[in-house]
Amino acid sequence: VPFAESFLAIVSSQEVASGELKNFQVPNLSIREHKALLRQQCRDRRMAVAATASQAIVGHFLSRLHQQPAWQTIALFLPLPGEPDVTSLLAAAPDRRYVFPRVIGKGMEFHHLIDITSQTTAGPWGLREPLASCPVVAIEQIDIMLCPGVAFSHARHRLGKGAGFYDRYLAQTSSHPELIGVTFDHLLFEELPHEEHDILMHDVLTEKGFASQKGASSSLQ
């Protein structure tokens, strides 16, 4: 059975568009094919989410941040269209140090930014990224990392965009900063296809709050 027909036989396009699809399994697909299907469907769905959801995400994180004085260096990301935008944290909590990723070949490094407008430039993948002249911050100095993704699960798995930048970056050390997946609630699934080497998030944050507050275990509680 062709890949597209297998999917359409199980879930209607209305279910996908409405955000009702929280956990689906398509038979006879490899993990790679299953991930590819999820990426496309999730991209379509997240484009419809209102900007107010990003504001709610920032609000929930600020509530947690005020309880965590040890989180001094925070890794953020510059969003693609349709992704949560958490960059307002720089103005909301200016006493912390914020770092952002810059792609270098097949890898990436994080740079300290103070002003996003003047200290970023157009980079690959349609993203803005820090200027190379901005100070580089080593992974060992990052206290907490907010990670983008196409989707996340309650089991804290992350479905990335497929390029593997975060996986390779985090594989540098076994001592990771606290990892928080950031997504919209309709892209938080019960389960996702995953592999043994996939790195788990410590928690997942949506406009409805931290997943750990809804019963999922987390080291951040």
Pin down the residues of each PLM region.
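Short polar/charged helix/loop
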Residues: G162
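Flexible, active-site-proximal loop/turn residues at the rims of small-molecule/cofactor binding pockets
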Residues: L80, A151, F210
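A structured binding-face within diverse protein domains that lines the active/interaction site
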Residues: R128, P148-A151
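Short beta-strand segments
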Residues: F77-P79, P101, C147-P148, G181-T183
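Short capping loops/turns at secondary-structure boundaries
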Residues: P135, R158-L159
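Surface-exposed, charge/polar-rich loops and edge strands
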Residues: F7, V11, E15, L21-E33, ...
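N-terminal active-site beta-alpha-beta segment that forms phosphate/nucleotide-binding
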Residues: F3, F7-I10, L21-E140
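Aromatic side chains
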Residues: F77, F110, W125, F152, ...
